[in-house]
């Protein structure tokens, strides 16, 4: 007979197991992904789902894939056609994006921040310097002027005082909104959780943007399913392969009368906001000119020089506003060769952006690396010390090998344009191009991601004493010297053939 204490212990253990399973399901982890980080076999990934709209489409990678699920991210590719507008949307997770192709303008809505972009040109039929008036105010304007002529001097002074106060409170703005910025090929765009953003394609080709949501980020207080919240637009095709019902914007769920009272509009207009019969999707085509208040487009060199002024931290060019969340920069172009962190004329270049170059990344805890590898070149073997890496090929092809913690090769494939590779934290990898160039963008789940190389001048092997190397690998002292000192580069090298370069031939920044 089983004793009562033993039975209680067994029952308690079963309850703990069931509670763990229910908790995992409540976090959005499907039962088949109970061991989501079993990464013994990685693969090159492509989009599995496409959501089409009137003026573009959004392609999604399966976020239930064990590799993507383990990294705690969700990846999508947004294609906006010429004249297309990606309607205001926000997410429960922070988002980092890279503009692969094209140009446009984008805006974000930061709650609590003022509208700092204003168009002060008067409306049609409005005199310069006078506040805007509605239709009723215009109809009664003549009567008010006649009444003013009959008033005494004291009444005129009192009315002028009231008009002056109203003029200070309400100026003749046609429109006023939060910050609008130009975006172009090579831009990194960072968006905080809960901040709505929109994008309009101003170019003559499709605007292509690769996006990453960090759904494991501390800012996401929901489950590990990517959730899209729309201020406008809809998704008539459903949210995913498992969720086929139509998704409406957030205003659709309110009673139209309540919405009309909140916005002080009529019920008919409130129903228009709910887009009940609109099937255009979340990317719509703009008919006619798209007129928003925006600054003129800078020259690329002038823009970078303004963002990164030379001189000490207390430079006179720094006005101190960049530390506020309302005016904090969200864009940084990392495709300019002059911005390269590592540059070798015959091999390629690597550029990183982190919280030091784009402070908002410290808040969302993400960073990015842009790389261009020429033919017959190699990125020396390395691993990420404190981040997962999601590598996306923007051009060309290359061979990528990944080794796990057991020393097993878990990936050895050719990666081509439009494909994705997840490289978990601590997994060593090497990138090798052949005849074709290889270009990529990597998103990393740390604001200041660090790497450690396994070969080269700053590698882990270079830092070890010769005696440690000889005893670890059972080799001679001369062989240990060759292992330590034959590769003089730090990041990029030749992929095949040739003799080791002299230090004088290395050009790295």
UniProtKB/Swiss-Prot annotation:
Cited Gene3D superfamilies: Jelly Rolls (2.60.120.10)
Limits of the Cupin type-1 domain: 42-271, 332-481
UniProt KW Metal-binding keyword: no
Gene Ontology biological process terms, A to Z: seed maturation
Signal peptide coordinates: 1-23
Task of the protein: This is a seed storage protein.
Family: Belongs to the 11S seed storage protein (globulins) family.
Name listed for the protein in its UniProt record: Cruciferin CRU1
